[in-house]
Amino acid sequence: MSIGRRLTASFAGIALTALAACDGVTGVGSRVEPALIIFYRDSSTIVAPDTVSRGEAFTVRIKTFGGGCTREAVRADVAIAGTLAEIRPFNRTQNANACTADLLFLYHTVQVRFDVGGRTVLRVMGEQRGASTGGTNGPALVERAIVVR
């Protein structure tokens, strides 16, 4: 085997070892958690039209909080019953010994459709962190009313 092939094989072995040891790259050692929607004095924003048409889907965009070991928006579950749409966003958090000390906004986009008219509510359910919860998270919700014609 030539020196070039031995070096290539050695570098490939080192790269595979490093990749296998890095949880952040492979996704191993992570957990999916309810998104943080209230962070101290800041609340998530719910971006949606003020008025929508009955039976027509529309886009809802939710800003959640991340940073540190939480760096990815994973999914948002939607359940609609009458005039209420419950949206539960989830983010991925890496299990790590050390994380960055930053704050990120992670966005979730969903489609919602109401089949009834009148005043309806978009309810985002997730977690909160603040002075009242200390270093742990607690349940939270943020709502926005819209009109269906």
What are these regions (language model features)?
Residues 16-41:
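Bacterial Sec-dependent N-terminal signal peptides
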Residues 54-60:
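Structural beta-strand segments of beta-rich domains
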Residues 60-67:
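Aromatic/hydrophobic beta-strand junction motif of beta-rich domains
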Residues 88-114:
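An anionic, turn-rich surface loop/hairpin at beta-sheet edges
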Residues 127-141:
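Short acidic/polar inter-strand loop motif in beta-rich domains
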